[in-house]
Amino acid sequence: MKKIRIGQGFDIHQLAAGRELVIGGVTIPYEKGLLGHSDADVLLHALCDALLGAAALGDIGKHFSDTDARYKDIDSRKLVCKVHRLLAETGYRVVNIDATIIAQAPKMAPHISGMIANIAQDLAMPAGNINIKAKTAEKLGAVGRGEGIVAEVVCLIANSDEGEAQP
């Protein structure tokens, strides 16, 4: 019997001077970047959590600790590729992804197609099965004041063969 599972991921990072802004593996020209142990790619971190959660494999912190020097300043696309391998090892493939980025600035719309292309490549899936939306916080809260950026991701995974997937 085919198994399907859903996953949900959330991440938030503070904006800080002196950092590159990388979201969805795309470097976005901006005066600030996201603060974190890795490249702080808020979208890809939420994606990793959604995929790991769907497969009952824990979360990003379990697999890629922010105290582990191996992950200092790592390109989060490498983390997505590692999560993809973990899913494959348990018999799952990604069916679709729906994501929302919440940022007061900069505008994300010009960069969304690049984000989708990166995720499709890293997860070996059709770009047409990935949707990314961008919203503002309507100037409310820390995100609305431009202090940080949030990403939320939901995903659907299914076992890729006729047998039972082993979580």
Swiss-Prot record:
GO molecular function terms noted in the UniProt entry: 2-C-methyl-D-erythritol 2,4-cyclodiphosphate synthase activity; metal ion binding
Enzyme class: lyase
Coiled coil spans: none
Cofactor: a divalent metal cation
Pfam families: YgbB
The enzyme's E.C. designation: 4.6.1.12
CDD domains: MECDP_synthase
Cofactor binding note from Swiss-Prot or TrEMBL: Binds 1 divalent metal cation per subunit.
Catalysed transformations (reactions): 4-CDP-2-C-methyl-D-erythritol 2-phosphate = 2-C-methyl-D-erythritol 2,4-cyclic diphosphate + CMP
Residues the record lists as binding 4-CDP-2-C-methyl-D-erythritol 2-phosphate: 11-13, 37-38, 59-61, 64-68, 103-109, 145
Pathway: Isoprenoid biosynthesis; isopentenyl diphosphate biosynthesis via DXP pathway; isopentenyl diphosphate from 1-deoxy-D-xylulose 5-phosphate: step 4/6
SUPFAM superfamilies from the UniProt entry: IpsF-like
GO biological process terms held by the UniProt record: isopentenyl diphosphate biosynthetic process, methylerythritol 4-phosphate pathway; terpenoid biosynthetic process
Annotated site residues (Transition state stabilizer) in this chain: H37, T136
Stated family: Belongs to the IspF family.
Subunit field text: Homotrimer.
UniProt function note: Involved in the biosynthesis of isopentenyl diphosphate (IPP) and dimethylallyl diphosphate (DMAPP), two major building blocks of isoprenoid compounds. Catalyzes the conversion of 4-diphosphocytidyl-2-C-methyl-D-erythritol 2-phosphate (CDP-ME2P) to 2-C-methyl-D-erythritol 2,4-cyclodiphosphate (ME-CPP) with a corresponding release of cytidine 5-monophosphate (CMP).
Entries under NCBIfam families matching the protein: ispF (TIGR00151)
Protein name per Swiss-Prot or TrEMBL: 2-C-methyl-D-erythritol 2,4-cyclodiphosphate synthase
Organism: Nitrosomonas eutropha (strain DSM 101675 / C91 / Nm57)
Native organism taxonomy: Bacteria, Pseudomonadati, Pseudomonadota, Betaproteobacteria, Nitrosomonadales
Gene designation per UniProt: ispF
